[in-house]
Amino acid sequence: MTDATPLLGRSLPELQDWVVAQGQPSYRAKQLYQWLYERSIHNLAEISVFPKAWRQSLQAVPVGRSQIVDRSVSPSGSIKYLLRLHDGEIIEAVGIPSGDRLTVCVSSQLGCAMACDFCATGKGGFRRHLAPHEIIDQVLTVQEDWQQRVSNIVFMGMGEPLLNLDAVLAAIRCLNQDIGIGQRGITVSTVGIPGHIRRLAETKRVGDRPLQFTLAVSLHAPNQAIRDRLIPSSRHYPITDLLQECRDYVQITGRRVTFEYILLAGLNDQPEQAEQLAQLLRGFQSHVNLIPCNPIDEVEYQRPSKARVDAFADALRQQRVAVTVRWSKGLGADAACGQLRANRSTATLPA
């Protein structure tokens, strides 16, 4: 019996069902589980503990692993990967080192429909959702290439995670419960989709465990006019409505919300705009990540000076807003926030 659905992403009980359906004893599922998630195999024929005849019959069963077609290293040590999927499409993932930690920035969609004005991914449009195994594979690929255990995952690559929420939650379940990455080390970023933050809050659980990962909302503006310019979809989703959903999320989950704010020189980096932002977030259980703009070819936005960034952060702190400045580490490899877009025209694809 064959099954075209990749095995990567399945839980141990699901693998037990699959193994038994193949006419094998159920204990083989534990072996398969270990080889999938601890040894990160690409083909079932690699499982030496399986009977040879069965291994040979399993060669056509898809595990769900991608192929690295290019890797670019930034001066800071971050590595951007171009990964070829089963259908020939290319996605991007980034490995980001920090001391003894390794963070993976993963994609949740092939392309993105949000078309944010400062982001490279949206310039290429939306092609399709990624399946759970295609998300999980990005983490295993980086972990395997670095020969280092992944400690953190950020859903800040290609795509809008909440528009592919079922697959994202399925991937997080596996990454947490099967691969052993703590939920508190996982961040899911969104520009804000009407009703979807509430839907996420009401989910409450990931698999059989409480929802504990971090929600990061890409706010990027202190008022509706600037947000409409930067994020076209926000024209149908007022900031007041977005923030109310975020407040509901905090109340339902007990988890604070992180707000991402990209600083663009001369547009949203003025002291008075810091005060507007502080007013928006007053009384909110939240944290603000300030991200100085990362340049991309198609837009004219510039990164503010360090003095301007520091002044903006100080203005927020004076208003009792918790804030962190995030200087991107992937600039030299076009792997920083806002720069991810799989470039199939320049990637060297092996025959």
Swiss-Prot record:
It comes from the Bacteria. The active site is at 92 (proton acceptor), 337 (s-methylcysteine intermediate). The keyword Acetylation does not apply. S-adenosyl-L-methionine binds at residues 159-160, 189, 218-220, 294. Binds 1 [4Fe-4S] cluster. The cluster is coordinated with 3 cysteines and an exchangeable S-adenosyl-L-methionine. Its EC number is 2.1.1.192. It catalyses: adenosine(2503) in 23S rRNA + 2 reduced [2Fe-2S]-[ferredoxin] + 2 S-adenosyl-L-methionine = 2-methyladenosine(2503) in 23S rRNA + 5'-deoxyadenosine + L-methionine + 2 oxidized [2Fe-2S]-[ferredoxin] + S-adenosyl-L-homocysteine; adenosine(37) in tRNA + 2 reduced [2Fe-2S]-[ferredoxin] + 2 S-adenosyl-L-methionine = 2-methyladenosine(37) in tRNA + 5'-deoxyadenosine + L-methionine + 2 oxidized [2Fe-2S]-[ferredoxin] + S-adenosyl-L-homocysteine. It is found in: Cytoplasm. [4Fe-4S] cluster binds at residues 112, 116, 119. Its cofactor is [4Fe-4S] cluster. InterPro entries: Aldolase_TIM (IPR013785), Methyltransferase_A (IPR040072), RlmN_N (IPR048641), RNA_MTrfase_RlmN (IPR027492), rRNA_lsu_MTrfase_RlmN/Cfr (IPR004383), rSAM (IPR007197). SUPFAM superfamilies: Radical SAM enzymes. Residues 98-334 form the Radical SAM core domain. Disulfide bonds join 105-337. The keyword Ubl conjugation does not apply. It holds the Pfam family RlmN_N. Its main location: cytoplasm. Keywords: 4Fe-4S, Cytoplasm, Disulfide bond, Iron, Iron-sulfur, Metal-binding, Methyltransferase, rRNA processing, S-adenosyl-L-methionine, Transferase, tRNA processing. GO terms for biological process: rRNA base methylation; tRNA methylation. Reaction proceeds by a ping-pong mechanism involving intermediate methylation of a conserved cysteine residue. Specifically methylates position 2 of adenine 2503 in 23S rRNA and position 2 of adenine 37 in tRNAs. Belongs to the radical SAM superfamily. RlmN family. This is Probable dual-specificity RNA methyltransferase RlmN. It comes from Synechococcus sp. (strain ATCC 27144 / PCC 6301 / SAUG 1402/1) (Anacystis nidulans).
